A protein has these predicted regions:
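Outer-membrane beta-barrel proteins
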Residues: 2-182
Length: 182
């Protein structure tokens, strides 16, 4: 319950603090390519441009289908778009499996993304990696991701998502979402 309250608080702060330019809600089917275990991942994302910087906030909850547990993480990023490409840095907070004391950890993020008009929609893709300390035991992860957004009505789009994780976490995912632009 504390995590849900924290997520709701972050969402309200994100929208009110810098007037979000967009909000996305997404549900993905995720499959671990090593253990073959699968789960549903739910995302809530907010983003805005403030003083020429791209600010982002992502909240993710994964629920294992076999009932063994939940994973939850929150990431905040800041980037600068140059010639249509946005390199960014950020911080992540992972509660670990089931939020058990001692399993939580923080990590840095570095990434790059960009997009372009493609047919009736917009294609967007990128890659991000966790930047842990050299001797950290926290899991390392690099994610390549892509989204194709199809306009439904003015300022609302339907999103098709794909991603692949590498390093310590090996996952493939696909999903659907909605984005509202403000």
């Amino acid at each position: 319950m504390k995590k849900s309250m924290f997520t709701a608080l972050l969402a309200v702060l994100a929208v009110s603090a810098f007037g979000a330019d967009y909000a996305t809600v997404e549900v993905d089917h995720v499959r671990d390519t090593v253990t073959k275990q699968s789960y549903a991942a739910e995302y809530v994302r907010f983003g805005a441009e403030v003083a020429g910087l791209q600010l982002g906030l992502q909240d993710r909850t994964g629920d294992y289908r076999d009932g063994t547990g939940l994973f939850h993480s929150t990431e905040a990023t800041v980037g600068k778009t140059v010639f249509g490409i946005t390199p960014y840095v950020g911080l992540g907070f992972d509660d670990g499996k089931n939020g058990v004391a001692g399993n939580a950890y923080q990590y840095g993020l570095v990434g790059i993304n960009g997009g372009l008009k493609a047919g009736p929609g917009y294609a967007f893709g990128g890659v991000k990696t966790r930047a842990n300390e050299a001797h950290s035991t926290n899991p390392k992860q690099t994610v390549a991701y892509g989204t194709y957004s199809i306009p439904v009505v003015k300022k609302v789009s339907f999103d098709l998502n794909l991603s692949k994780s590498y390093q310590d976490i090996h996952e493939n995912s696909y999903g659907l979402g909605f984005t509202a632009n403000f």
